[in-house]
Each structure stands twice: as structure tokens, then as C-alpha cells.
Amino acid sequence: MGIPAAFRWLSTKYPKIISPVIEDQPITMPDGTVIPVDATKPNPNGEEFDNLYLDMNGIVHPCSHPEDRPAPKDEEEMMVEVFKYTDRVVNMVRPRKLLMIAVDGVAPRAKMNQQRSRRFRAAREAMEKEEDKQKFVELLKKQNGKPQEEEPVEVVVKKAFDSNSITPGTPFMDILAASLRYWCSYKLNTDPAWANIKVIISDATVPGEGEHKIMEFVRSQRGSPNHDPNTRHVIYGLDADLIMLGLATHEPHFRVLREDVFAQDSRPRLCKICGQKGHDAMNCKGEAKEKNGEFDEKDAVVPLKPFIWLHVSILREYLAIELDVPGLPFQFNLERAIDDWVFMCFFVGNDFLPHLPALEIRENGIDTLTAIWKDNLPVMGGYLTKDGHADLERVQYIMAGLAKQEDAIFRRRKETEDRREAGFKRRKLADEARQRRAQGSRQIRQAAENSGPPAGFSFHKINEFPGKAPQPSITHDMVVNRQAVDQANVANKSAASVLKDQIKSMMAQGTSTPENGAESTETPAETAAAAPATEEQAAPPAALGKRKAELIEDAVAGPEASSTEVTEISESDAEPTDSVRLWEEGYADRYYEQKFKVDRKDIDFRHKVGRAYAEGLAWVLEYYFQGCPSWEWFYPYHYAPFAADFVDLGKMEIKFEKGRISRPFEQLMSVLPAASRHAIPEVFHSLMLEETSEIRHFYPDDFEIDLNGKKMAWQGVALLPFIDMPRLLAAMETKSHLLSPEDHLRNAPGKDYLLLSDSHPTLYDHITSQFYSKKQGTTKFELDPTKSAGLSGLVEKIDGYVPHGSLVYPLSRNSMPDVDYDRSLMVHYFFPDCSHTHKSMLLRGVQMPTPALTRSDIDILKGKASRSGRSYGGVPLSNKNYSGRNEPINYGPGGGQQGGRGRGGYQGGGGRGGGRGGYGGNGGGYQANGGGYYNGGNNGGGGGGYGGQPRDSYGPPPGWQPPPPPGLAGFGVGPPPPPPGAAYGGAPGGAGYGGYGSSRGGYQDNRYALPPPPPQAYQAQGQQYGQGGSRGGYQGQGNQYRGPPRQDRGYDNRGGYRGGGYRGGGDNRGYR
């Protein structure tokens, strides 16, 4: 999913959702014999699982181009690695009923745009790396003065596997599909743990993304009346959207399995250039490979990377607490609330839309949206979503609430970045100062040693400073960063001359320079090596790149370019300029003018973009909950709108047409650059390369990457032209007749496979009796769930397939054995037809897992939930907003009006009819039409409400006295000392006092007394009659008396001392 860092954010916020996987390992005997894991034994994790789903792209990618070991030499080695990895995952989970393997097939058009961006970037990065390697080899030859040995040169220039080949329609995907079918059949023949399980393989010829094909299967089984609601599911994959998909199934027994990518890896990192240990690509010298031992033995076995569980059931527990909104005018439904939360996560990032500018996962953007949702849920009258369909009129409330915070979010983001950058620069300057002092001291001592001591003096011998340093070695990092630091090098040369003068001055009396003329034998490369390593690790990406460039340039330039002076690169050279400047006024005009190339006054265009984005949100929601609503829809812009540009969403009518599913070659031509054309049939190459081709501009050799306010290129936006699909199809049609029969076969849509062993107690006989008995019936029939262990769907006979034949390994080198008597069975499989809508509900008969959260966990989470989303990601509700205006922040349309009972105080400024007074407290006041006396001491009494005749729904407390007459609503100067805790509501038609209630157990008892009257000079000010919530007093909405500046403001009609006065805090919590 397109939410970077989403998994880490979730696991940090909800720590109990993560637990380590307990894994049995194969046993190696002294004679070298390996005893495999016995997966028939009980699962060591203490729970048995029914179904395991593998999103295979998360396995194929790390196996084909690993980071911790040399890449496989060819496709056959890759397949063997895929077999090993998959076997390890299956042995961890030990599914007892079903294994489903899903490979990405043709994707919806909305996904193709993201794939196009990734693949063009990958091709350009591969080309740049290859060019860097070539330059690196040439420099090595020049430095050594002789031709480099053949082996390292071949290793350096060796081309890596093109990961763009992992795309539907390529020969590689054909090899993968055949290999997976072989391996699963082999395991069904040889592994007892596979005897009773069913295997479904959905390869790249079947349209749809792997994880969404898996979810379609789960939804189809839930719709069957024979489905077990307590089925225990595990899905393996690296994408964060698997968590959202798991929640969307509403299956409580669901886990996500993945590698613990944050665990410390004890395996040595290999250089990506030469493949050797001991250094990285930045410090590669291209030296010949050293033998490991006498016979170049392989390394000893290193610990495998651990795996972790993510428990969706425990995440549901956390969300049940965090999303709870008491006092709703309708019944709270946890399943609907979870759907809303998943929907709001799409605002922060997904694979189909650019994320909204104001929302970042690292800034707790999801918490910000959750706070807005909780505040508006009573007003909206219901949930944002229902069974995967969005209510856009209610979505408008969320966007309006976010729009009120956008200015604050952008400004606070800038402040945070500035503080972080300033802190890094301070640390950098301090480190450089330490290095200069140490270098200057070494240079002085060396100069004195080289010139010889004066007569009568002797020095202690210093062994650690040699007379002459070796020539600095050229490294890969010097080459790739040379261009970025040319300007700094020029500046450093002038600083070097200053250093020379200083050294000559210190050596003037009775000293002479060495014969070789070198004032210092300390090389800049050594100076760079003395820099602490922790700085590089802790530095932000932009600053890290700048620091590396400076150190590299010093090493390349030689001793003359080193300097003891601080030579800073100008800001324009250090990092790109953000011309939009979201933190400054007018950012919206600049944004649309620069990003969309439209007139800044064209407001209608902004609303058009907002409507297109809202349509995209509706598409994504339905895609996750019901399946792909349209294969042809896509978002037609590179950038997202602002929240303020979502206008009149409730008037939109969205209806998607299913559309046409692209064929594999059409997707290849849509997403691959010309550099990866080897994966595309040769007949189409001319369309990508020839200038006369009408679609040549779809495949630019170079393209712009807009950093869009980010620091690193990979975070930017690739400005590639969108594919005009009708033109592409028309161009391809002119070449399609030249395709070979094998190509036509690869371009055709495929079917899923169902595999099982002949030892399955019922299903094997159930299928063979229909397809391969003397009484053969139809070639396609519906499975009986009582005989298939609950599996619903249809199966079809494969033409030409005969059971109990031989199983042949499909690749050439026979890395795996053939099986003469194949005991497995293979048929085509089709999901059961689900014409009805998948309901967001728990199924009847489900038994919920044992709760994992303790009372302490719940209390802590409730405390955090009350503040969550109201700090960094948005404006705290208890404070003024960033512009200093006292107005609602998180509320959408309607402000403080909530069904005729405004919240008063900060949230709505009083509303109609005495609302709750100040924020956070059930303020002391009568509601309109006598809605009762509120407890005046709960988190501080709010301002008393006007209007209405009181009823005796709640009687006033003993000893209660009526409030003073109108006109005594506030003070304009400093308040008198507070009396004992009192809480008063307004009389009919009168301006009430805010309560002097307790603040979290502070100043409260059962005595009630009037506050002292204000000075006579101010009694006439601030009178305000009317219905409900007039503010009166200082800063009142009536006769607005503005008291002397910089004085305490007394009662700011927002409840008690501290209601904007005594402490000037405005948090309405009473005197404390």
C-alpha cells in the first residue's frame, strides 16, 4: 500500500498486535544429512491455522534480487530460492485445510499508472548504476596504471536481473507459473503434511493483483452457507495494505505474516558492485575476489531473518476502544466504524491516488482524521461507509474539518523541519570543529617533526603519524557524487591557501618544509575516516547526501583541497528550492499554478480536481471491500487537491462501469520503458523506439521528477505522460498479427488451478469420479462442500491432463527431481458466483478470540485517544487555531450546532440553548427549554446557557442560589481570588457564569456560593440577551468590551477562571 512507514506506525501505536513467530528449523546431522521440519506435528506457536494465503510477489522479488547475498545467476536458481522460501513459510504456518498462492496478474488501469512510474524509475536507476560502474572501472585503470584483472572487471560490469521482468506477460512469469505448479505437485507427493490440504494457484495469467485475488476468494467463501465462521486465516506479504484487507474481511481470526524487517540482521552486507564482504558500494575498490579458505568455501550458515505475526483480532480490540464515541444519537456499530477507519487510511496513502498534502503518516495523519471523525460522527447522523460504498455527503464533513487545520499543519511541518535541520547543522559544525582541531594539531606536530628539533630539545616519538600518507583510493561514491560537489571544491581551494599560510607562519623560526613540498601528510581521506560514523547514520537524507559529497570531494581533490575553514555550500546548492512554500500565505494559488499549470484564479478547476479525487476515494473503497468496480478508471492528475477544494460532494453521483480488462501485452506496453523492451515481444519494439511511431512519446528516454517539497528523488513525483489507451491499442493492433503462437498463448487470460493429493479422504474421489470414471459426466461441476472440507466453487477438467502420470521438472538443469508416479491431481478452479454485496458484519456463530488487552492497556489507550490527533497533526481542540482565531477546528458543516444543543465554549462558541459550556467539561448551565442542570465540576464549568425555562429533569444541588441578574457576565480586568468551587447555570434569558468547578479532582466541594460582583465601572459592559449561548463580559459577542491590553481578562465567558482569562489559557477547565 502507498503508505510509507504504515506498518511501523501501526506496530508502534498498537504494540500488542505484533508477536514473534516460533519456528522449527531443519536439523543437520554430523554426517551432513539434513532432517527437514516435520510439519505434521502441532504448530509451535500454540494455535493451528486452516488457510494460508501467499502474495507471491512478496517472495519472488527478494529471491530474484536479494540484498544480503549475491543474486542468483539465472531463472533456475531463482526458482530454487523461491521454493526454499515458500517451504519455510508453509512450515511456519502449517495450514491444515488450504494453501492459496496468488501472483499479480493484469492490474486495473488505476494501478498501472503507479506501476508505470515505478518501472520507469527502476530502469533509469539501473542505467545510471551501469554508467557509474563503467566510469568506476575506467578510473581504477587510470589510478593503477595498468589494466585491471579480468575477474573484477567482469564482476563490476555484470548486469543484474531486470526486476521489471516480474510483470504479467513476460517469459519469466511463464517460467514462474510452471515452476510453482511443479513444486506444489512435488510437495503433495513427498510431504506428509500436505496430504490433506488443497492448493489453489492463481498465476499471472489470471487478471487482478495477488492480494486482491486472495480477498476475492475469502469473500466468495464467506458467502457460502457452508463456510465456517471460525476459520483461521494467515496471509503472507510485505505490503501494509494486507492489514487493511484483513480488517475489510471482517473475519476476526486473521493474521498477517511477514519478515521482521526492523530486526538486526547479523548477516554481512555485500557490496552491490563486486559482491564481496567487508565494504559497501561507496567504498568499493574493484579488487579481485579473495578466496574464502583454501578452496573458496561457502560461508557458514548464518541465522535466518525472523518473522513476526500481526494479529488483526488484537488490532480490532484497539480500534474498538479508540473509535468508541459515547452518546451517539444512533447505535454504535464497531464493524461500520472499522470500515470508516480503513477508508480514512486511504486518505493518507494508497497505490491509486496521491496522498493529500496535509496528511503524512509520520505526522499522525490517521490520528488527525480519526479525531475529526469522532467529533463529527454525531452530526453526520451515521457512518462514512456502508459495505464498501462511501456516503460523500458525510465525507464532506471530514474534508471540511481537515480544511480548517491545513494552514496549521503546513506551518507546523515547516517548523519541525527547520528545527530538525538546525539541530543537524549544529551537530555537523561541532563535529567539523573537532576534526579541524585534531587535524591542525596533527599537522603542527608533523611539521615540527619533519623539520627537526632545535638544538637541546627532544621530543617523544609519535608512531601513529607516518611521514607520508598513501595516495587516497578512488571509491564508487566519489564517482557518483563528483558532479554535486564541484562548486564546493572550488571554494575549498581558496581556503586551502589560508591553511598553507598559517602553517608556514608557525614554521617560520628555524624550520623548513619537507623536500617534497607537502605541508601536511594527513590526507583528507584519513580526515574523513576520522569522522564519527554515528553522524552519518543519524542524519536526515538530504543532509547525509550533502555531507558525503563534501567528504568525497576532499578525497578526490587531494591534500591541496583540504581546509580548516568552514566552507558552506549555498542553500540553493545544498537542497532543492520548494517554490510552493506551503507554510506561507497564498500557497494554494502557487500550488495550482505550478503543479497543474492553470490560472491561480480558476477556482472551478480546483473543485474539479477535488471531485475527481473524491471519485477516486470511492473507487478505492469499493475495490478493497467488493472487488474492482472499474478496470478502466484512473485518477487523471499527478497531484492531489487540498482538503478545502472538496466542495458539494453530497451532490455527486458516482457510478462505475466495469469496463474492459487489459491483456498482458497491453499492460507491458503501458508500464514498461523502452529500456526493458527485452521483456516485450520484439514485434512491438518499433512502436517504442522509432520516431515515426505515433506512441513514441509514451516512452520518454528522460523525464522530470518533481521533488514536491521532499528531499530525496525517490520521494518525488515522476511526471510521465498518461497512456492514451485507445491510441495504444490501435498502434498495437497493427503489429499483433506478427505474434508467434507462443506469444499469443502468453497474451491470453488464464484460469486458476486446484491441486490435491490422492490421499485426501474425500475430495480426490469426488473429482475423479466426475472426470475420470467410466461414468464421466460434465467437464465442469460445482463442488460439494461436505466432501471438499468446506471449499465452495466450481472445478473444470484440464484438456489433455491424465492423473497418475509422471511429474517432470520444467527447467533444464534438473535442480529438482522428476516423479515417475504422480499422486497429485490438478483441475481448473473457479470461485463461487457471488452476485450479492459482501456485508461488513461478523458471521453468525463466530466465536471471538480471547481478549488480549488488559484493563491497564485499555485505560492507557483511552487516555491517549482523548488527545490523539489533536496535537502535531492538527490543532488541539482546547487551544486557539494557528491563526489565533477562536473558532471550531474539527467540525465540518454546522460548527457548534449539534441537533439544537450547541457545545458552547470553544467548540461552537455557545451554540443555541445552554450547551456544555467549555470544552472538556459538562459546564454549569441550563439547557435550552430546561434541559437540566449539569454537573458543574467536571473538568471545569462552562459558560451558562441562555434561554428556555428550566424543568426538573435534574434538580439543582442543595444550597444552590440563582445567578445574578444580566449584566454581571464578566470582568474586564484581573479577577478576584476564586471562591470555593461553584457551578452555575444561566437563568431564563440571562447570562450565566461559568462554573468554578474542579479541574481533574482539583477545586471542588459541595458548597455553592456566588462569585463576588465585578467592579461597578464594568457591570454595564457585556450585557447580552437572547436565546442560547451569548458570551457577555470581556470578549463577549454582545457589547464587545475590549479591556486594556496585556491584562488578565477575567471571565472570558468560557467558563471559570482560566476560561481565557485568569491564566489566559482558554481551555475552560475551571480554576486550578
Curated annotation (Swiss-Prot):
It comes from the Eukaryota. GO terms for biological process: DNA-templated transcription termination; mRNA processing; nuclear-transcribed mRNA catabolic process; positive regulation of chromosome segregation; rapid tRNA decay; rRNA processing. It is found in: Nucleus. Residues 892-911, 983-1000, 1025-1036, 1056-1072 have a biased composition (Gly residues). Belongs to the 5'-3' exonuclease family. XRN2/RAT1 subfamily. This is 5'-3' exoribonuclease 2. InterPro entries: 5_3_exoribonuclease, Xrn1_helical, Xrn1_N, Xrn2/3/4.
